[in-house]
C-alpha cells in the first residue's frame, strides 16, 4: 500500500480547490475556525489533518469530505472488495502534534455525491493522555471490531469493547482513541451534511 500517494492527494486537492475558488489561506482559516499555521502545514504536506479539520475545510470549500479521498466517481452502487479496503490514508487526531494516529480504509471512495463516509479504521496505540476534543457538523457511528476504544464525548467518557457501538452527534466535542496504549480496529461511518 502506498500511503504517501493518498496523503499527497489530500494536500494537493485542498490547495487546488482553495485556489480554484480564489480563497486565500487567511480566508480559509478564518471561515473554518482553524489556525492559519495549520492550513499552511496541511497544504505543505507537513501535517496530516484529522477528520474534524478536514470536514470544516470541505464545508468552506463547498465540497463533500470524500472529495479529498476519491480516485473516481461512480453514480451507481459501489462495491468495495476486501482487497480494495486495504489501501489506507493515515490521519492524525491532532494535526499540529502528531504525524500519524489512525489508518482509514475507505469503503466508498468512488461513490459520487455521498453524504456518509464509511471506514474501517486501524487505531494505533498512543501514549497520549491529554486528548484535544474536536467537533464538526454531522453524526458518527462507531462499532469496535477488535480491541477496546475510549470515546471522550462532551464531559463523558465511554469504553467500548469488541462488538459494542456508539452513535453520536459530532457537533459535541469528542475524541476517539484506543484504550490505554493498545491497538484497535473499528468500523466508523461519518455523516456530514453539505
Identify the function of each model-found stretch.
Residues 1-11:
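Single conserved hydrophobic/aromatic residue that forms the stacking wall/gate
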Residues 19, 30, 59:
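Alpha-helical residues within the helix-turn-helix
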Residues 22-41:
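Short alpha-helical DNA-recognition segment
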Residues 52-67:
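DNA major-groove recognition helix of helix-turn-helix/homeodomain DNA-binding modules
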Residues 84-94, 100-110, 118-136, 170-173:
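Conserved short histidine dyad/triad with adjacent acidic residue
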Residues 100-103, 161-162, 170-194:
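Ligand-binding loop in jelly-roll beta-barrel domains
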Residues 107, 154-169:
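Short acidic-glycine-tyrosine-enriched beta hairpin
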Residues 122-124, 135-151:
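Short, conserved beta-strand element in jelly-roll/cupin
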Amino acid at each position: 500500500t502506498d500511503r504517501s500517494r493518498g496523503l499527497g492527494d489530500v494536500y494537493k486537492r485542498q490547495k487546488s480547490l482553495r485556489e480554484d475558488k480564489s480563497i486565500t489561506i487567511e480566508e480559509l482559516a478564518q471561515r473554518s475556525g482553524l489556525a492559519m499555521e495549520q492550513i499552511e502545514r496541511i497544504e505543505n504536506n507537513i501535517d496530516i489533518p484529522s477528520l474534524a479539520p478536514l470536514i470544516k475545510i470541505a464545508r468552506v470549500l463547498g465540497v463533500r469530505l470524500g472529495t479529498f479521498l476519491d480516485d473516481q466517481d461512480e453514480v451507481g452502487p459501489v462495491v468495495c472488495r476486501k482487497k480494495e479496503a486495504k489501501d489506507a490514508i493515515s490521519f492524525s487526531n491532532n494535526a499540529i502534534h502528531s504525524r500519524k494516529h489512525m489508518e482509514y480504509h475507505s469503503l466508498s471512495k468512488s461513490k459520487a455525491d455521498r453524504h456518509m463516509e464509511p471506514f474501517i479504521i486501524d487505531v494505533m496505540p498512543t501514549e497520549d493522555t491529554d486528548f484535544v476534543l474536536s467537533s464538526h457538523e454531522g453524526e458518527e457511528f462507531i462499532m469496535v471490531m477488535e480491541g477496546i476504544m475510549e470515546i471522550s464525548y462532551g464531559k463523558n467518557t465511554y469504553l467500548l469493547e469488541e462488538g459494542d457501538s456508539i452513535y453520536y452527534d459530532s457537533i459535541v466535542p469528542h475524541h476517539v482513541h484506543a484504550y490505554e496504549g493498545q491497538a484497535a480496529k473499528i468500523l466508523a461511518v461519518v455523516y456530514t451534511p453539505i
